[in-house]
Amino acid sequence: MKTCHSHDELIHIYLDGDATKEQKEELYAHLQSCPSCREHLQELKKSIAFIQSSSHIEAPEGFTAGVMAKLPKTKKTAKWKLKAKRHPILVAAAIFLIMMSAAFFSAWSHTTDGIAVSGNGPFVIDKEAGVVVVPEGEVIDGDLVVRNGTLVLEGEVRGNVLLINSRFNKDTLYASPNQVTGEIEEVDKALSWAWYNMKEFFNEVVAVFDAGEDDPHSTDN
């Protein structure tokens, strides 16, 4: 996005909370007549809110120390420090993506420990056979999640079905989609698991932003 070069640094000072009263007034006046800077500032605000909303995601224990230990020792220069200082949001976003990816891959390793099911309704688990059965005539209200097993769906699921490292029983494979009111998604690889979690996370963030934009009391300075 093309912005006015003369006000680009002022925008970053404003977002860092270091702008003086005069600088704020100058920026507000400029935003009234410059749509590109106004849109750029709005995108930066959304990026900051996105990063702050992800504070609950943690990297695996020892991850940071391990990464730092493997980094090659290089001579520090003022050039990269200047770039990092001028683009703190890009640096923070890169660190966030690394930590989030590590957390998702770590979570995937725990999904292969044994058969597990979550859902609101009657179902039968045969751990020895690795089978989950929703009996005929029974209804699962809401989403059904099956990990490391085979799903035999004879009843109905009023929601989504997520199969993590799992599959449908071959006898019910073609009939089952007609018994699910929501979506059916299969995740059988670590990358698919990471993508699924990232997609769900981004959907939640977008929903928060949409709710904020629909709020008539929310205004930008």
Swiss-Prot record:
<feature type="topological domain" description="Extracellular">
    <location>
        <begin position="109"/>
        <end position="221"/>
    </location>
</feature>
<feature type="transmembrane region" description="Helical">
    <location>
        <begin position="88"/>
        <end position="108"/>
    </location>
</feature>
<keyword id="KW-0812">Transmembrane</keyword>
<dbReference type="Pfam" id="PF13490">
    <property type="entry name" value="zf-HC2"/>
</dbReference>
<keyword id="KW-1133">Transmembrane helix</keyword>
<feature type="binding site">
    <location>
        <position position="30"/>
    </location>
    <ligand>
        <name>Zn(2+)</name>
    </ligand>
</feature>
<feature type="binding site">
    <location>
        <position position="37"/>
    </location>
    <ligand>
        <name>Zn(2+)</name>
    </ligand>
</feature>
<comment type="function">
    <text>Is the anti-sigma factor for SigW. The presence of RsiW leads to the inactivation of SigW, and its proteolytic destruction to sigma-W activation.</text>
</comment>
<dbReference type="InterPro" id="IPR027383">
    <property type="entry name" value="Znf_put"/>
</dbReference>
<keyword id="KW-0862">Zinc</keyword>
<keyword id="KW-0479">Metal-binding</keyword>
<feature type="binding site">
    <location>
        <position position="34"/>
    </location>
    <ligand>
        <name>Zn(2+)</name>
    </ligand>
</feature>
<dbReference type="GO" id="GO:0046872">
    <property type="term" value="F:metal ion binding"/>
</dbReference>
<keyword id="KW-0472">Membrane</keyword>
<protein>
    <recommendedName>
        <fullName>Anti-sigma-W factor RsiW</fullName>
    </recommendedName>
</protein>
<dbReference type="InterPro" id="IPR041916">
    <property type="entry name" value="Anti_sigma_zinc_sf"/>
</dbReference>
<dbReference type="GO" id="GO:0016020">
    <property type="term" value="C:membrane"/>
</dbReference>
<feature type="topological domain" description="Cytoplasmic">
    <location>
        <begin position="1"/>
        <end position="87"/>
    </location>
</feature>
<comment type="similarity">
    <text>Belongs to the zinc-associated anti-sigma factor (ZAS) superfamily. Anti-sigma-W factor family.</text>
</comment>
